[in-house]
Amino acid sequence: MKNSADITVLGAGSYGSALAISLASNGHKTLLWGHDPVHMQTLAQDKCNQAFLPGIAFPDCLQIEADLAKALAASNNVLVVVPSHVFGTVLEQAKPLLRSDARIVWATKGLEPETGRLLQDVARDVLGEQYPLAVLSGPTFAKELAMGLPTAISVAGTCPTFTNDLVELLHSPKRLRVYANDDFTGLQLGGAVKNVIAIGAGMSDGIGFGANARTALITRGLVELTRLGEALGANAATFMGMAGLGDLVLTCTDNQSRNRRFGLALGKGCDVMTAQAEIGQVVEGYRNTKEVFTLAKRLGVEMPITEQIYQVLYQGKSPVDAAKELLSREKKSETPAQ
């Protein structure tokens, strides 16, 4: 079946819109679909996403499509950019409408709610084995990507041809550098765990602990991510790249991060509900914390920072008490014997 578009993007929030803008700015005909018809009509009229990316005009190659069937019929390349807690639901909606030659990539960062499963497992459960799968991950703030500021990300998948095609589609010499990676598991995990650690970094700064504490938390957070990744068969080297260290540093240190701002509010004394309301958009790290904690417990992986953040978010522990518990842990070597 011939494509009438180069790629279809499912999810018209800030990140989905930014990726669609970047793709269309490369000269690729891009369809952008969202679940809210009123929102999609507004996007079509304004020719920009005024709600999430105000003032950034859509390129001529970007087309708004409110009909999911039409959006999925237009291209065999489907990029899913929705919150992790609705990822499976969106795939269920898409499944009967997908072309037989469809190829699915997602930029969703997170794990399955309640179970902590990787999104690749969710996708396989819903879609079966017939479609090539891939994931896009790395340090990207939507606004900067949409503005065309230099950005670098990684992509990995189940099919090398699809991965290479995505590199060609997404890469732009002027705005976006894309690295191919063969660690499908590692790229998915990095995008979830960094959200958790960013909440912790925000809490630390909100309390007023300073740059030393923030840096220590980021460094030990990277250790936790690597530990969990290795337990799942990921390559430790992945976590020194874009989807690990890169995304972790970005999300933990810049207030464009909703997860960091959420943590800041908690550190300054807000309760969880008030802090979420203050952000006004989905704070992926709130759910990710429970998901990562669940996964670590199931695998028997020690993740003390994640555990303390979980206790703050879900068990009412104060951020100060969580910090005290981390600092009072038993002394240990930074490089334990293997």
UniProtKB/Swiss-Prot annotation:
Positions annotated to bind NADPH: S14, Y15, H35, K109, A142, R258, V282, E284
Binding site for sn-glycerol 3-phosphate: K109, G138, T140, K194, D247, S257, R258, N259
Keywords noted in UniProt: Cytoplasm, Lipid biosynthesis, Lipid metabolism, NAD, NADP, Nucleotide-binding, Oxidoreductase, Phospholipid biosynthesis, Phospholipid metabolism
Cellular component, GO annotation: cytosol
Positions of the catalytic residues: K194
Entry EC number(s): 1.1.1.94
Catalyses which reaction(s): sn-glycerol 3-phosphate + NAD(+) = dihydroxyacetone phosphate + NADH + H(+); sn-glycerol 3-phosphate + NADP(+) = dihydroxyacetone phosphate + NADPH + H(+)
Keyword field contains Ion transport: no
Function: Catalyzes the reduction of the glycolytic intermediate dihydroxyacetone phosphate (DHAP) to sn-glycerol 3-phosphate (G3P), the key precursor for phospholipid synthesis.
Annotated protein name in UniProt: Glycerol-3-phosphate dehydrogenase [NAD(P)+]
Organism per entry: Shewanella baltica (strain OS195)
